[in-house]
Amino acid sequence: MEFSVKSGSPEKQRSACIVVGVFEPRRLSPIAEQLDKISDGYISALLRRGELEGKPGQTLLLHHVPNVLSERILLIGCGKERELDERQYKQVIQKTINTLNDTGSMEAVCFLTELHVKGRNNYWKVRQAVETAKETLYSFDQLKTNKSEPRRPLRKMVFNVPTRRELTSGERAIQHGLAIAAGIKAAKDLGNMPPNICNAAYLASQARQLADSYSKNVITRVIGEQQMKELGMHSYLAVGHGSQNESLMSVIEYKGNPSEDARPVVLVGKGLTFDSGGISIKPAEGMDEMKYDMCGAAAVYGVMRMVAELQLPINVIGVLAGCENMPGGRAYRPGDVLTTMSGQTVEVLNTDAEGRLVLCDVLTYVERFEPEAVIDVATLTGACVIALGHHITGLMSNHNPLAHELISASEQAGDRAWRLPLGDEFQEQLESNFADIANIGGRPGGAITAGCFLSRFTRKYNWAHLDIAGTAWRSGKAKGATGRPVALLSQFLLNRAGFNGEE
């Protein structure tokens, strides 16, 4: 689908369709008023007859409106004007895209980007429109034999901005929005792929393909089990012992700043391509969704794609920690004591708390990069779902400025995160009689104790942990990966690169 931006008056548009907003109760937006004026009150007369109230999501498609050059006008309800916020704006865009796609409008000029959204500028409105459009049209049908497509799908969308002065920021918004949307799609595709296809080797192949596609700035190295053993990554290796699939750690290095003093931001993604729970096996119901336990790695991959596409002037390293947790004769057991790469020992009390055992060794491994910051992304705990539900990602950090940066980026991107505490009182729950640390700390504060566990391996750098167990995928009829937190991390890195979205 093609996107562009322009500045023009609605009466001069020759298009298959013009999209304008209507507020409750039957109040025309400024652009709709202009169209009403040139059509001699045609639109307002329809509203007076009760054809459209203006409630969020209501639509009315008009054909051959008098004196209007475009073939059709799509009126879309936006709710009460003063209550149009970020969430409602995106819902209106989503409804618009679905309506245009379902009614055979192959191209359209959208004036919704001129609506006033509280606290948001034109760059944000255009970028979110692009991201939302791509999200709305996403489908995962690679493995279906019968693929359904609209007969006349939407192919071209033009977003209007109020003045020519805003064209540059609008074009930049489209560029950024497309790159982020492509990163989200890549993450969703990886997450939705079945575990018999998407294993650690598949993740590694995707990482290598990324380096091939962006060879100017990207290098990928894949570290196998033998090299991990030599590095002392025994905790990581133990998790994969029960699987016939080799554990592989893919390291994607992007260099956008040639300065020798430029330290990288490191992103670490948990890549459990299937998590049965191991010997502490999970219930059968819903176990199919444990293919999504690699969504942290998928998100990191998507972000690295975005960074490479936009050629951001920063250095970023993404690590995909690929592994599979299966029961078997070689599987690790409750009661085992593992020696981590850091030298600390861990008593395994539950083999289904495996993500932290993989991540702790990777967090030690990345010390060699002397990072400016390290952010790990993991579907780590069911406790985080209980705490924050399916709408907000859990955030923990050992560095207040980094935590504040991430929270700010989450608000900018509409991909929200909420900070949870780390404290010595929680660390006490991880005490073990037989090792330096236990891999679980009981039910109370389970998301926090998982973060506390990881924090013991991050003392040499600024670190943040994103628990995406509640936000990485949806269950039920709309089952599928969400691509979160690609938008959050993309915004964080855009901010670091100097593109903070301010006009």
UniProtKB/Swiss-Prot annotation:
Disulfide bonds: none
Entry's cofactor comment: Binds 2 manganese ions per subunit.
Record's keyword annotation contains Membrane: no
Catalyzed reactions per annotation: Release of an N-terminal amino acid, Xaa-|-Yaa-, in which Xaa is preferably Leu, but may be other amino acids including Pro although not Arg or Lys, and Yaa may be Pro. Amino acid amides and methyl esters are also readily hydrolyzed, but rates on arylamides are exceedingly low; Release of an N-terminal amino acid, preferentially leucine, but not glutamic or aspartic acids
Cofactor: Mn(2+)
Gene3D superfamilies for the chain: Leucine Aminopeptidase, subunit E, domain 1, Zn peptidases
Cell compartment(s), UniProt: Cytoplasm
GO CC terms of this entry: cytoplasm
GO biological process, one term: proteolysis
UniProt-listed Pfam families: Peptidase_M17, Peptidase_M17_N
EC numbers on record: 3.4.11.1, 3.4.11.10
Record HAMAP family: Cytosol_peptidase_M17
Protein family (similarity comment): Belongs to the peptidase M17 family.
Protein name (record): Probable cytosol aminopeptidase
Species per Swiss-Prot/TrEMBL record: Citrobacter koseri (strain ATCC BAA-895 / CDC 4225-83 / SGSC4696)
Top-level taxonomy: Bacteria, Pseudomonadati, Pseudomonadota, Gammaproteobacteria, Enterobacterales
